[in-house]
Amino acid sequence: EAERSKENALGLLMKQALEGVVAVPWTLMLDKWRMAVFDGSLNEEELNDYWWELRKKYQGVESPIDRPDDAFDPGAKYHIPGNTPYTRYYLARVLQYQFHEALCESMSFEGDLHECSIYSNDEAGLRLRNMLAMGQSQPWPDALETITGQRTLSGKSLLNYYAPLKEWLDEQNRNRACGW
């Protein structure tokens, strides 16, 4: 029964990671490409090649076919022609886990971070409410500090949340060549 429970937890973590964690390099890559366009470091002929260079570097994927010289694959993502920054999605992912870990710590939770629930916890609710009540009246580092005790963003909480999954994946992939 304990083994089945562990498998269920790993399955849930895998599902969550495939929905959320894989978005982190995509969101970073997309705005890195946008910034290179805006700062003028790319000419028109390099736009698509640089897109695929970043996709390979950050996501480990390549175009399934050779791309013609006039291809503009970035335009398929509506945020590109719509000139919509994507950094907000990157920050949201990082902050989601940072907030969760801080709120779990505020209620003295002990255990794997993915098992913590802040539901109906008065202390966690008060911290979250106090931060949200600030609205735009304070700089964001002040709001972050209210809930986390820190003034900087950190990806450590994301790593802590998925630590059991990473441990399992490391074991499954032992003696295998993984990566790009």
Task: Pin down the residues of each PLM region.
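C-terminal, non-catalytic "cap/extension" segments appended to globular domains
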Residues: 3, 7, 11-13, 19-180
